Amino acid sequence: MSDFSVRQSIEAMEEYSVESVAADIIVNANESNYPLPTEIAQKVAAVTAHFPFNRYPPIKAENLSEVIAKELDVDIDCVKIGNGSSELLEKACYVFGGPGKKIAVPWPSFSMYGEYAALADSEEVRYPLTPEGFVDADTVISFCAQHKPSLLIVCNPNNPTGNYNSLAEMEKIIANVDCPVIMDEAYMEFADGKELAPNDMRPMNKLWLVAGSTLSLLGKYSNLMVFRTFSKAYGLAGLRCGYAVGSIALVRQLGKALLPYHVNAFTLMVAKTLYENKELFKERIKTIRAERDKMAAYFAKLGFHVWPTATNFVTFRAEGELMQQLAEAYEQKYHDKLPAQAASGKMLFKYLLENSILVRDFTSHPVLQGCLRISVGLPEENKQILAKVTELCTEAKL
């Protein structure tokens, strides 16, 4: 790059990319494998026939912000819409980060947090999770007191481990740090937590949305922002839509980093239609939870270590005798020598891919070495996945 002037932090980065791999069963990106409910698809189709594609969208996505604010009983100025919650996370790092600033993020967790911090010329500082992937409030509070970050990000439930951390533990953090706190709740709809903040009197028909979530703490803490997405539980990953809810003071600052018309009109229309009919997803979410728990229990029975999960995915790796058997099978088949933990995960990843099943490979991760992460698919897909994992484990033991 000697002929051009490029920011040093940008030049030092690698462009994010994921290899495109064809497979019959795709369970590597925590997407929903379900189509839109028929009723919602029909509503969208009816509007699309006469949709004003020639017009700009609402300049601040007010049409979607309004229905979310009404549902959560907050002022519309407490809500911001983004192209996925990822855009909002990136912009938050611009707003609250910058040269000389630190952004505290969990580790291991969503890898893009560090990318957003770097783009904002901020220093990423990583606070550790427990060995089982949980957030320890006292650890985070001490970490923030020592490092003095200008922004703290907590991923709950955590990706890629899947852990759900209690509302009490999260509130303890929010109440005891001196910086804005982002609660990234991309997977909260899948959590089984039924606890609520003390004296929460919201109507019962809304509790499924806020149960176990820091959304129930809105209004109590001025340093809190909660980020949610339509990509996971609601299956809109292809349209990119998410939202942030928090105090007016914080959300107003976040809005300054968002460009006019930054979310397209079609996405806003579909997301609004979906949000107004989100009750249609309740049974689907229950099914995904049940399938997730069944898969986790099955992997554990086969001899894998499974991380406690409250999401739409399961993260696991082989240990002990099973790890050695899979590692030996990998070396024999591919004539490649890797540490046993990494080799066992790589063997399973390749075996599934050879059977047209694509999962997420974490075998080279410095903390999650040997791990695979499998999104919960349709029930019939999950059966095929379990059958192929069983098949390989049986062959490896022979």
Name each region found by the language model.
Residues 1-55, 148:
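N-terminal "arm"/small-domain region of PLP-dependent enzymes with the aminotransferase-like
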Residues 28, 246, 315-323, 339-340, ...:
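Conserved PLP-binding active-site segment of the aspartate aminotransferase-like
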Residues 37, 223-307:
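PLP-dependent aminotransferase class I/II
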Residues 62-102:
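Phosphate-binding glycine-rich loop
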Residues 95-154:
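PLP-dependent aminotransferase-like
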Residues 135-147, 160-181, 185-231:
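Active-site pre-lysine segment of PLP-dependent enzymes
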Residues 288-289, 293, 299-355, 378:
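Conserved PLP-binding catalytic core of the aspartate aminotransferase-like
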